[in-house]
Every structure is written in structure tokens, then in C-alpha cells.
Regions:
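Generic helix N-cap/helix-start motif at coil->alpha-helix transitions
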Residues: 120-127, 156-157, 191-200, 228-238, ...
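Positively charged, polyanion-binding regions of nucleic-acid-associated proteins
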Residues: 1-20, 25, 29-30, 35-50, ...
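Phospho-regulated, low-complexity intrinsically disordered regions of nuclear gene-regulatory
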Residues: 55-116
Length: 408
């Protein structure tokens, strides 16, 4: 995805563009590291950004040029701590002045910038901005006082009741979810639905770029309530990994899925695990997991592409995989989808050095196994087995053997 698309997506969903938000969305920055930085546990955010500095600066400058082209206004943001002992301390984004300047900008529409004289003359505007900061930093008691102050200053404020709801929900997230064991999943799912349908739209409307920080404790609360719960097809989004995904906490996503012995049988979990590996820079494991998903979801009866699998593939963010997928779809002679796993493996021959026997065992796809056996025989210089494996691959699909011969 280009930086232009990233800017467009943020403008559409949050009304402004923030480089920090892009880093989190793109997986270059783990939310747990960002949160630790805000809590004063990390002194320099750049150390935890998984992107080469030169490339990062290039991408951020490209985004700035596009923002300027759109007529957006860049405002410098002060990033301060979320704890009492660092609440007034300006946090360090980077040791590089150039990168600090780029990361500290938020780009907003001209119409969203309050006129300075109006801002200075209207105390309710000042209070509202303090309230937004208190909500983002999870200072619920301070937010309570600021809501009362806003009411005293402007009892008819259009968003007053919305802010009251956000403060009330913030207090609500401080207690664990109270659910009877026999109704646990149902109760947690009701919490999730309320969060997604009511709180998230309100938070994005009122807090915009700061909504992620406000919402994180709610998702963490749901995730922690679901830890150890196996996937339940009746409540597909009531799995800890789903809640962790909303926070872009990919380490926790990976852990919660691998801790569920049933994950290999569920497409949602396999795709989420593949994404987690991708954003954790474990590319080979990501592609292998995606092959497991393809094997699970592909319709072997008529060899056609399953609709839900196609949706997964269209959302998968790996550029090399997408290129292989596109080449397969663009072949002059249309091939049955059942041979796609073998096609992927032959386009990603390095995968054989990373595949564990336990990962192969659940895969039933004949084209994958034939391609794998051939690549292993070639790697081991076993000419007899390679010849037999070539015949086996040819019997499954001539095109796959042709592809193998092209790369060897």
C-alpha cells in the first residue's frame, strides 16, 4: 500500500493523518512498545520502530508532500507521558531532528483548525481539548472533572453527552468483565458488540487520532477475559486474538492463537496468525500459515476458489505473495485452484528451509506435497528421488513441472 493510500485511509476513518498512527497500522511499531513509551518505560520511540531510518524518512516525506497537495495543515503534536510522574514531560521520538519533526506532525483539514482568537476567547474550547487529552491518557478522574467544567462553561455543548458517555465507559473498563461461567462467551460477546457499535464510532468522532489510545484498555479487557478460551464458531470474534488484533498487538495475537490447539481447523485464526507473523517480520512462517489456510478453505470438490478464501487473499499485505497470486490468476490457460499451493511453494522455494514436519502434517493438498518432495530431493541432491518426484508432479499438473524446470 502506498503512502498516498495510507493518508487517504486515515482521512476517511479518523479525519486527519498521523505518522504514528501509520506506524501502528503498518506494523512498523508495536502498540505495546508505543504504550510503554507513553508510560515512561521506553526513553526513545525510534529504537522500537521496525523500519530503516532512511526508508522511514523517505516514506514520511512522501506522505507530507501528498498532505500538502491535499491542502492539509501540519500541526506539531506534543507527546507527553500518561503517568503522574511523566505527565508534563515531553517524550523523545527520535535522536534525529529530521525524524522527530516528521513524526510529531499531525495533518488536518483547514476547516478543522479553530481560529486562534476564537480559541483564546472561548474557555470551553480549551477545556474540551484538555478533556480529549485526559480521555486518551486514560485519566478518568481528571476527565470527570473536565466534563463537569465543560458543563459549567457551555451547558448546551453539542458533544457534552458524548463525552459523558466516553468518561463513563472509561470507568467501566477498569473492572474485569463479570460473567457467569455458563454464559461467559455470550456476555463477553455482548461487551464486544457494544464496544464496536456504540463506543468506537463515538470515540472516533470525538477523539479522532487519539481514539486508539482511549479504546486500547477496552480491547485489552476483552482479550484478557478470553485468554485460554478455545475458538467457538458460535462466537467467532470472541477469541482473545481478535481483541489483540484491534490493538495491533501482534505478539499477543500470535501467542493466543498458538495456545489454542484447535487453530489449525479455523480459517479466521489461520489468517489472523498469518497476519501476526507478517507484522512481526516472520515472513516465511506467515506464508506457510497462509498455505495451511488455503489448504483448509479451498473447495477440493470442484477446484474453485472459495469466496471467503478469496477475501482473505485480497486482504493479505505481502507484496511478493500478491504478485505470485496475480501471476497465477493471469495465466493464459486457466488452472484449477487446487494446484495453487504447489504454485506458491515453487515460487517461494526458500520456504522448504523453514517448514517444520508438524506444519506439513495437516496439509492435504497433493500439489503442495508433490512440489515439496521434489524441492527436498533437489536440495539433498538425490537424483533418483528427484526423478520420481518430477513424474509425480507432472501427473498432478504439467504447468507446475514446467515452472520447476524454469527455476532449476
Amino acid at each position: 500500500m502506498t503512502m498516498q493510500h495510507n493518508v487517504d485511509n486515515q482521512l476517511m476513518s479518523l479525519g486527519s493523518y498521523s505518522p504514528i498512527e501509520w506506524l501502528l497500522e503498518a506494523g512498523h511499531l508495536q502498540y505495546s512498545d508505543y504504550e510503554a513509551w507513553r508510560m515512561g518505560e521506553i526513553d526513545n520511540l525510534e529504537k522500537h520502530i521496525d523500519s530503516p531510518t532512511k526508508e522511514l524518512i523517505k516514506n514520511l516525506e512522501q506522505a507530507e508532500r501528498f498532505c500538502a497537495k491535499l491542502g492539509l495543515i501540519g500541526e506539531t503534536q506534543d507527546y507527553r507521558g500518561w503517568k503522574q510522574d511523566n505527565a508534563f514531560k515531553e517524550l523523545t521520538l527520535s535522536q534525529s531532528p529530521t525524524l522527530t519533526k516528521l513524526l510529531s506532525k499531525q495533518w488536518v483539514r483547514q476547516d478543522d483548525i479553530p481560529q486562534m482568537d476564537l480559541f483564546m476567547d472561548n474557555p470551553s474550547v480549551v477545556t474540551e481539548n484538555k478533556l480529549i487529552e485526559a480521555l486518551a491518557s486514560r485519566q478518568w478522574d481528571d476527565a470527570d472533572k473536565l466534563v463537569d467544567q465543560l458543563y459549567q462553561q457551555d451547558a448546551n455543548h453539542a458533544q457534552l453527552h458524548g463525552y459523558e458517555d466516553l468518561v463513563s465507559f472509561g470507568h467501566h473498563t477498569e473492572a474485569p468483565i463479570d460473567a457467569e461461567p455458563q454464559n461467559q462467551l455470550e456476555t463477553i460477546d455482548e461487551e464486544r458488540i457494544g464496544l464496536e457499535q456504540e463506543i468506537i464510532p463515538l470515540a472516533r468522532q470525538l477523539l479522532q487520532q487519539k481514539s486508539r489510545d482511549y479504546l486500547a484498555p477496552a480491547w485489552q479487557r476483552i482479550a484478557q477475559s478470553l485468554e485460554g478460551q478455545p475458538y467457538n464458531i458460535a462466537y467467532p470474534q470472541s477469541h482473545a486474538s481478535y481483541a489483540w488484533e484491534q490493538m495491533q498487538n501482534w505478539k499477543a495475537v500470535k501467542h493466543s492463537i498458538l495456545s489454542d490447539d484447535s487453530y489449525i481447523h479455523h480459517g479466521e485464526l489461520l489468517f489472523r496468525l498469518s497476519l501476526a507473523y507478517h507484522f512481526l517480520k516472520e515472513r516465511e512462517q506467515s506464508v506457510i500459515t497462509l498455505i495451511q489456510l488455503i489448504d483448509l478453505k479451498a473447495n477440493h470438490a470442484d477446484s474453485e476458489l472459495d469466496d471467503s478464501l478469496e477475501n482473505f487473499l485480497n486482504l493479505y499485505p505481502d507484496a511478493n505473495f500478491i504478485a505470485s497470486w496475480q501471476r497465477f490468476m493471469d495465466l493464459e490457460e486457466e488452472q484449477p485452484f487446487i494446484v495453487f499451493p504447489g504454485w506458491i511453494l515453487l515460487n517461494e522455494v526458500g520456504l522448504i528451509h523453514h517448514i517444520e514436519p508438524a506444519q506439513i502434517k495437516p496439509i492435504k493438498n497433493p500439489s503442495f506435497h508433490a512440489a515439496y518432495e521434489l524441492l527436498v530431493a533437489k536440495r539433498d541432491n538425490n537424483e533418483t528421488e528427484e526423478l520420481e518426484a518430477r513424474k509425480a508432479l507432472k501427473n498432478i499438473n504439467v504447468l507446475l513441472l514446467t515452472l520447476y524446470l524454469q527455476i532449476h
